[in-house]
Amino acid sequence: MDLPGPIHDFLLVFLGSGLIVGGLGVVLLPNPIFSAFSLGFVLVCISLLYILANSHFVAAAQLLIYVGAINVLIIFAVMFMNDSEYFTDFNLWTVGDGITSLVCTTLLFSLISTILDTSWYGVIWTTRLNQILEQDLISNSQQIGSHLSTDFFLPFELISIILLVALIGAISVARQ
């Protein structure tokens, strides 16, 4: 969006704080329904951040796919679960939980150190140069397709593997 600087900065800080509060709500709220609604709030804030970044197609896809389908599916799944078996085991801390938290913390700190050590100056100029060159050549959807099949092929495939693992995990949990 073409907003004046202070308004853009205010909206950015407001949506960022909404993301933080919503993310804490997802993790810390004991009721799974409230956590699912908090996740919906986080996904709407992410969509609004995409609108601020002039990525209207990605914002619409975020709203339709994640908020409209995935979050509603999560809410329905939580509402139909037998809640008595899930609320009794919340206070147990197992070895798997400790290992999982250790791995996640290690990944978080390695990601933060990688982000801080990377020189982003050349990346920003390359992105702007590509945007200027591709602005007149093809439409936005064609640009997204060409970037997914060339520049972002590896992250796209990694996301598909993560989704496959999540699907297998959901099926194994549902079978138990």
Swiss-Prot record:
Q: Does the keyword Mitochondrion apply?
A: no
What is this enzyme's catalytic activity, as reactions? a plastoquinone + NADH + (n+1) H(+)(in) = a plastoquinol + NAD(+) + n H(+)(out); a plastoquinone + NADPH + (n+1) H(+)(in) = a plastoquinol + NADP(+) + n H(+)(out)
Q: Which UniProt keywords apply?
A: Chloroplast, Membrane, NAD, NADP, Plastid, Plastoquinone, Quinone, Thylakoid, Translocase, Transmembrane, Transmembrane helix, Transport
In terms of superkingdom, the source organism counts as Eukaryota
Principal localisation: plastid
Record has Cell inner membrane as a keyword: no
MF annotations from Gene Ontology: NADH dehydrogenase (ubiquinone) activity; quinone binding
Q: What is its EC number?
A: 7.1.1.-
Location of this chain's protein in the cell: Plastid, Chloroplast thylakoid membrane
Q: Which InterPro entries match?
A: NAD(P)H-Q_Oxidoreduct_6, NADH_UbQ/plastoQ_OxRdtase_su6, Nuo/plastoQ_OxRdtase_6_NuoJ
Q: How does it sit in the membrane?
A: Multi-pass membrane protein
Q: GO CC annotation: what is one?
A: chloroplast thylakoid membrane
What stretches pass through the bilayer? 10-30, 33-53, 61-81, 92-112, 152-172
Protein function: NDH shuttles electrons from NAD(P)H:plastoquinone, via FMN and iron-sulfur (Fe-S) centers, to quinones in the photosynthetic chain and possibly in a chloroplast respiratory chain. The immediate electron acceptor for the enzyme in this species is believed to be plastoquinone. Couples the redox reaction to proton translocation, and thus conserves the redox energy in a proton gradient.
What interactions and quaternary structure are annotated? NDH is composed of at least 16 different subunits, 5 of which are encoded in the nucleus.
Q: What is this protein called?
A: NAD(P)H-quinone oxidoreductase subunit 6, chloroplastic
Lineage, top ranks: Eukaryota, Viridiplantae, Streptophyta, Embryophyta, Tracheophyta
